Amino acid sequence: MTTPFARFDDRARRSSWLVWGTAVGVYFLALLHRASLGVAGPDAVARLDISATELGAFVMVQLGLYALMQVPAGLAIDRWGARRVLLVATLVMGSAQILFAVATSYPVALAARALLGVGDAAVFIAVLRIAAMWFPHRQYALLTMATSLVGAAGNLAATVPLVVVLDEFGWTRTFAITGATSLVYGLLLLRPAVSAPFRETAPSASEETGTEPSEGDPPARPAPRKPSVRETVANVPASWRRPETRLGFWTHQATMVTGVVVSLVWGFPYLTEGLGYSSAAAASQLSVYVVALLVFSLFIGPLAGRKPTWRTPMGLLAALACAGAIATLALWPGGRPPGSVVTAVFVIIAMGGPASQIGFHLARDYNPAVRISTATGLVNAGGFTGAMVTAIVVGVVLDISSGGTAATLTDYRWALGAMALLAVGSTVAMFGSLLGVRTLVLERMARGERVIVRVTEHWWDRLYRRVRPPGR
């Protein structure tokens, strides 16, 4: 006999939106945990008696392991599925936050942030995997945007609300509560869902070459069996060989690094120690960043989905704007920009978060479904590798400039200058990769092949071919 509860459970198990909603809840928690050190940085310095370099090392280790685990996480999702990986990730993140709550020494706290980076690594690409497998292709841009919005909400919760909770309950109880929340939420992931309606298939000839399918292409073959470990590992070089995957890697790095480094670790100390803001005012400024990120997500995500030809120009514009905004803070006469300028800079760098999603569109469109998670992991690694390097460089520059004493505004200007230079370097790499991809697309079009996104030849394409001829 079928009970009403059983019928409800069956409908719920078949709901694509319920599956995505459960998964994106993990992403909300992941962003809350990831950004929690942003406003707790000064408290960490006082509690653990650490320097600016050691504070930067928290982010370096957390983001470094996050970046390092991107490819293994993608392989695990391709091999065992998103639900199992999300369950493990949720439990690991919760345990890491509880360990961070009780840490009273720097090594223990560092180990906790490292564990958090490992748990966090798989969450976003698992949610994107669910979006790709549970929804039709036309809804992918919408789901990517919605995922970013939920993540931004988690980031927002790690600003003013977290400051209030820290002031009210203190370090230990605050981080213990957030960790316990993740552990309890993991219970929702114990029940497996039915098979995804848009399951992965083996790649067709057109998927392997990055062209649109032609009438003579055989249809993609169903791949009901789980890929072997060898086949899964082989996805890594196969994904990286795609020039569009490499373009996604650099796009993600060039657009997102400044926002991540500012929001996760160095924005709050710059505002409080460098510009003399109160903790509440600095947290409010970070909230402006998150709100701007939410607003930009409403526009950039849909545009990237509906206007494929606009994707890389939008990404390049966002990367240049972010680098220029950070340079403005570093080079402002006297070093103390007015509040309106600081707010404008935080709004501009928020553009990079939604723009970084363009890298995932490239991974999604130019890799067969059996490699989506691996390619997405490679793209995601680009941004967080850059963020790791930038965070530690800022800390080192601060320590060198300040001589180990309390950092001044001048010290922060040097550090921001270093951040701007690194952002420019990533943008140059993105532009070079973009020119290479455009050259390949123009060659395919000249041969009469159909391509996923058509391009129009410009003078810079001809100049690039002269400087770096095809085949080199």
Region locations from a protein language model:
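Helix-loop-helix hairpin linking two adjacent transmembrane segments in secondary transporters
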Residues: 146-198
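Helix-breaking motifs and short loop linkers at transmembrane-helix boundaries and internal kinks
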Residues: 49, 81, 102-108, 119, ...
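Conserved MFS/SLC helix-loop-helix module at the cytosolic interface between two early adjacent transmembrane helices
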Residues: 68-107
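Helix-to-loop junctions at the C-terminal end of transmembrane segments
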Residues: 69-81, 296-310
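Cytoplasmic helix-loop-helix junction between adjacent transmembrane helices
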Residues: 112-151
